[in-house]
Amino acid sequence: MSNRKPYVRDMKRTWWSNHPFYRFYMLREATVLPLILFTLFLTFGLGSLVKGPEAWEGWLSFMANPIVVGINIVALLGSLLHAQTFFSMMPQVMPIRLKGKLVDKRIIVLTQWAAVAFISLIVLMVV
């Protein structure tokens, strides 16, 4: 048996704050918190819809609260940030070839955003 002590490097809790890449990563991952609240708000909305018109009106007034509206706006911005980072990463992860040539990265990203805009427009027209 060896009496040698293994080297253990000290790791501070704020190690990520010294590097811009990791700061952005932590910001992007922290956007899940408002999304969780948004999902809970919608779940309670479904529950109030089942309970009846009075509960539904109470939920609608809750959703009109400025704090809840702010949380929903932050959740929307977080979702857009996730979409932007995913769309910009997609051409690097899965390069698309047409007739043996690589499709330009900007075209792939713009096509994804166009699909998001088109689907959003369809949903707005249906609802």
UniProtKB/Swiss-Prot annotation:
GO CC term (a single one): fumarate reductase complex
Locations listed in the record: Cell inner membrane
Residue intervals passing through the bilayer: 30-50, 58-78, 107-127
Keywords: Cell inner membrane, Cell membrane, Membrane, Transmembrane, Transmembrane helix
Top-level taxon of origin: Bacteria
GO molecular-function terms, A-Z: succinate dehydrogenase activity
Record flagged with keyword Cell inner membrane: yes
Topology in membrane: Multi-pass membrane protein
Family: Belongs to the FrdC family.
Subunit structure as annotated in this protein's UniProt entry: Part of an enzyme complex containing four subunits: a flavoprotein (FrdA), an iron-sulfur protein (FrdB), and two hydrophobic anchor proteins (FrdC and FrdD).
Role: Anchors the catalytic components of the fumarate reductase complex to the cell membrane, binds quinones.
Protein name stated in the entry: Fumarate reductase subunit C
